[in-house]
């Protein structure tokens, strides 16, 4: 078991010990993505407040890198940078837009989201949901500063969890 924990710790960079800790440390993440420069330790990941980025959620595991953080790189075309506390209304809205986040997809290790789960949402999708009155609350400390390229800070602050 310790070898498997070590593998995950080295794969993810740090153990996920955020508010929704991933309890099944023996299960490997189902998706691998190239490591960004910032995730390789050459520069710190910052949140929209200019502070170090904190874990968004690990139950279920979230983030482009599936390490619990809402951080991105050039390969993430969706820009999964906004840490949200998903609501029933947002899950219904997302499904109506063609992105069903509530239905489990076991083939991808995805359990489906429930209201209250913390999830990294694409910045353009969050802005679209905001414009339609359906944006979920945002955890500013866990939202990557790159989200500011799409969403004004004032909107994020007005919708802070």
Give the residues covered by each predicted segment.
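Extended boundary segments
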Residues: 36-89, 158
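Short, basic/aromatic beta-hairpin or loop at an interaction surface
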Residues: 85-100
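Short alpha-helix capping/helix-loop boundary micro-motifs
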Residues: 102-109
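Short, compositionally biased
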Residues: 126-149
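Glycine- and charge-enriched low-complexity intrinsically disordered segments
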Residues: 146-161
């Amino acid at each position: 078991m310790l070898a498997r924990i070590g593998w995950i710790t080295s794969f993810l960079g740090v153990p996920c010990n955020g508010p929704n800790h991933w309890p099944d440390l023996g299960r490997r993440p189902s998706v691998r993505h190239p490591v960004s420069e910032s995730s390789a330790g050459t520069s710190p990941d910052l949140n929209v407040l200019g502070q170090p980025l904190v874990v968004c959620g690990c139950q279920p595991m979230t983030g482009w890198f599936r390490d619990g953080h809402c951080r991105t790189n050039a390969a993430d075309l969706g820009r999964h940078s906004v840490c949200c506390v998903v609501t029933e209304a947002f899950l219904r809205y997302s499904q109506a837009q063609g992105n069903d986040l509530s239905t489990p997809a076991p083939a991808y290790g995805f359990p489906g989201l429930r209201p209250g789960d913390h999830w990294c949402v694409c910045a353009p999708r969050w802005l679209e949901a905001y414009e339609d009155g359906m944006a979920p609350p945002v955890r500013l400390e866990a939202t990557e500063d790159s989200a500011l390229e799409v969403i004004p800070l004032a909107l994020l602050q007005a919708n802070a969890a």
